A protein has these predicted regions:
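Alpha/beta catalytic barrel-like cores
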Residues: 1-80
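Active-site mouth loops of central-metabolism enzymes
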Residues: 14-28, 110-126, 130, 211-216
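Active-site-proximal, glycine-rich beta->alpha crossover segments in alpha/beta enzymes
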Residues: 55-134
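Alpha-helix-loop-beta-strand connector modules within alpha/beta enzyme cores
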Residues: 63-93, 154-179, 183-185, 256
Length: 259
């Protein structure tokens, strides 16, 4: 399944600000759906990783985050887009993409240094599980967690526990939980996640179905796509920049697919 993380770039279709599109479920659905039609990709994204998620989740001492997540404008718009896709006769594959717990932990520590790792990751795991449940019950087919960097060595177990909490909720709802990590040297893929390694992150021990992560910059995509027998998904390490020009994106995807 070819599914580069294309979201904000869809706002070019209507010539509106990507942030405005991300807060309007109908515009989100129309523009992202039209982008999929133009490019011939295999999935649509109802959300992309964004810094507002850390604010909605809050620190461990901020209490239950369920109400804050449900009230978040971007979350509400994404869920509304999923509902509209549910009524779409074409029934596209819908994926929700979020920041992962390591990225969220780093953001929360910028605002509140010294947060205890165990308490922080436990809080993030519960919060991401709530988020996954919201999207799974609304009708997404997959959730992707994108990490800007791997967790510090001393926090790997806490990080894996947080991913496991969210991943268990996804699997309960029969939604694929995917992990993408930008760190080129990262190879310690948690069993709870569908790994999506980049070219330098593949491991001989990865003998289960997994994906492949291309660069978030289409200029760095290969001339032709090559996938192994266990690679079921091709996405990108991060969101394709919203300012990337659509004509060039059409050409890059056509070359990638060998068209």
């Amino acid at each position: 399944m070819l599914a580069p993380l294309l979201f904000g770039v869809a706002a070019q279709i209507e010539a509106i600000d990507p942030e405005l599109m991300a807060r309007d479920g109908t515009r989100l659905r129309k523009n992202v759906a039209e982008l999929r039609r133009m490019l011939g990709t295999d999935a649509v994204f109802c959300s992309a990783p964004h810094g507002s998620l850390a604010t909605a989740l809050g620190a461990p001492d901020s209490g239950d985050c369920a109400d804050r997540l449900a009230a978040d404008a971007r979350v509400q718009a994404s869920l509304e887009a999923v509902r509209q896709w549910q009524a779409d006769a074409s029934e596209p594959v819908v994926i929700a993409a979020f920041q992962g717990p390591s990225t969220l932990a780093a953001a929360l520590r910028q605002a509140q240094p010294g947060l205890d790792a165990e308490a922080l990751y436990e809080h993030l795991g519960r919060g991401l599980a709530v988020l996954v449940r919201l999207f799974a019950e609304t009708g997404v087919h997959g959730v992707q967690f994108h990490e800007a960097a791997a967790p510090p060595p001393g926090e790997v177990d806490c990080w894996k526990d947080a991913l496991g909490t969210a991943g268990n909720v996804a699997r309960f709802h029969r939604v694929a939980p995917v992990l993408v990590v930008q760190d080129p040297g990262f190879k310690s893929w948690p069993a709870q996640m569908v790994a999506c390694p980049g070219a330098t992150q593949r491991s001989a021990a990865l003998m289960r179905p997994h994906g492949q992560a291309l660069s978030g910059d289409p200029q760095h995509w290969p001339e032709a796509l090559a996938t192994g027998p266990l690679e079921k998904l091709v996405t990108t390490t991060e969101e394709v920049p919203p300012a990337h020009e659509l004509p060039g994106l059409v050409q890059r995807l056509a070359r990638l697919k060998g068209a």
